[in-house]
Amino acid sequence: MVSESVQARIDKLLNEAREAVAESNWAVVLNRAQNVLRIETENEDARALLAAAERAFEMPS
């Protein structure tokens, strides 16, 4: 279990990542998801966002 302040930081990063998804800003999604996973390695939301960003980078434009 993480502290309240750490959880607030995780929530902020995840919200920023979700906003970036809406803008197709995959570099930000990737960055924010990786930051969450550095704090909480098993965070499922961050893992899903990271996977989405990685798929987006693999797609031809």
Positions of the model-derived regions?
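Alpha-helical segment of the N-proximal tetratricopeptide repeat
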Residues: 8-35
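Alpha-helical linker/edge segments of TPR/alpha-solenoid repeat scaffolds
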Residues: 3-10, 52-61
